[in-house]
């Protein structure tokens, strides 16, 4: 499979990391390797470790970056087929236990995952309900849709997709599966359309968009994994090291903003004459407001419209 994908906020993400020769960097979401290729072009020496839980992305990278993966005294690129929640553990296995100089995340589903019909991510193609980033994972969208209670389904659709008709959709799903399991993406799309009022179906894009997003987030535990990974990444960053995070959904951005705030701001008790070392901030925000795509990128890459980039430096 060719894992072609147009990287969003390419220069902004990598340039803000300020990569330096000899550094150790982590691409937490390797995908098509666009950000990785640009970062490696900025340094003559140093190593990038690319993580991706998608087997197809790793196999594609092994072909497209074969010249950089050849073992030598100082490998330029190493690939890890794993979720970015296991950053430190996997880095130690590779022999990197002294921290990293930079890390970046490009969150969300990549274009090839949407375009590969049998992955079940998209409401545009008819396929078995799947939505697993990691194909070795047991739980998929089919299981959630056919086993969760009406309340659990409604909560997922509302919390992860901001779907205001979550209760109606969840009710219709539970009623339909009484007759037979809901197997395919198109079956689910039809159920969603039936549950949403006609006036709402005519506005705001595809009626199944929010529900499919919510199920994908739930299947892959995206928000829990993101929060745990960011905490770990900040801990293993060396002083002066930087972290860049691109988000596409409001709930993702809220998590990044909250964690960056937690480590960059200090609440000193009233009357305390100085700030103890264990209360001092460990991050400095590079940008108070998120960086967004330029006019040129917005015109050439539709995926960039909702992208937000936040950057911070380890103190």
UniProtKB/Swiss-Prot annotation:
Its EC number is 2.1.1.199. This is Ribosomal RNA small subunit methyltransferase H. The keyword rRNA processing applies. GO terms for biological process: rRNA base methylation. Specifically methylates the N4 position of cytidine in position 1402 (C1402) of 16S rRNA. Belongs to the methyltransferase superfamily. RsmH family. It is found in: Cytoplasm. InterPro entries: RsmH (IPR002903), SAM-dep_MeTrfase_MraW_recog (IPR023397), SAM-dependent_MTases_sf (IPR029063). One of its GO terms (cellular component) is cytoplasm. Keywords: Cytoplasm, Methyltransferase, rRNA processing, S-adenosyl-L-methionine, Transferase. Residues 290-315 are annotated as: Disordered. The gene is rsmH. GO terms for molecular function: rRNA (cytosine-N4-)-methyltransferase activity. It is an enzyme of class 2 (transferase). S-adenosyl-L-methionine binds at residues 33-35, 52, 84, 106, 113. It catalyses: cytidine(1402) in 16S rRNA + S-adenosyl-L-methionine = N(4)-methylcytidine(1402) in 16S rRNA + S-adenosyl-L-homocysteine + H(+). Residues 292-304 have a biased composition (Polar residues). Its main location: cytoplasm. It comes from Lactobacillus helveticus (strain DPC 4571).
């Amino acid at each position: 499979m060719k894992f072609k994908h147009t990287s969003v906020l390419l220069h902004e993400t990598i340039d803000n990391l300020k990569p330096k020769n000899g550094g150790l960097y982590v691409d937490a979401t390797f995908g098509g390797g666009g950000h990785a290729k640009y970062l490696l072009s900025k340094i003559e020496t140093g190593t990038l470790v690319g993580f991706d839980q998608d087997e197809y992305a790793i196999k594609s990278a092994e072909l497209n970056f074969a010249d950089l993966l050849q073992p030598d005294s100082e490998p330029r690129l190493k690939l890890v087929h794993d979720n970015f929640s296991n950053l430190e553990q996997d880095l130690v296995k590779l022999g990197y236990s002294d921290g990293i100089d930079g890390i970046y995340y490009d969150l969300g589903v990549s274009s090839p995952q949407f375009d590969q019909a049998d992955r079940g991510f998209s409401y545009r193609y008819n396929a078995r309900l799947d939505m697993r980033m990691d194909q070795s994972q047991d739980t998929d969208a089919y299981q959630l849709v056919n086993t969760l209670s009406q309340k659990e389904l409604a909560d997922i659709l509302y919390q992860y997709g901001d779907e205001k008709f979550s209760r109606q959709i969840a009710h219709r799903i539970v009623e339909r599966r009484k007759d037979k399991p809901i197997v395919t993406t198109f079956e689910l799309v039809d159920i969603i359309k039936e549950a949403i009022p006609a006036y709402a179906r005519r506005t705001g894009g595809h009626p199944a968009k929010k529900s499919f997003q919510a199920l994908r987030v739930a299947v892959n535990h995206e928000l829990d994994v993101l929060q745990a990974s960011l905490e770990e990444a900040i801990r293993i960053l060396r002083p002066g090291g930087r972290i860049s995070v691109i988000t596409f959904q409001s709930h993702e951005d809220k998590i990044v903003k909250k964690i960056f705030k937690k480590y960059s701001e200090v609440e000193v008790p009233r009357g305390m004459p100085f700030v103890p070392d264990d209360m001092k901030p460990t991050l400095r925000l590079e940008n108070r407001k998120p960086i967004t795509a330029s006019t040129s990128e917005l015109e050439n890459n539709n995926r960039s419209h909702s992208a937000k980039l936040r950057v911070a430096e380890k103190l």
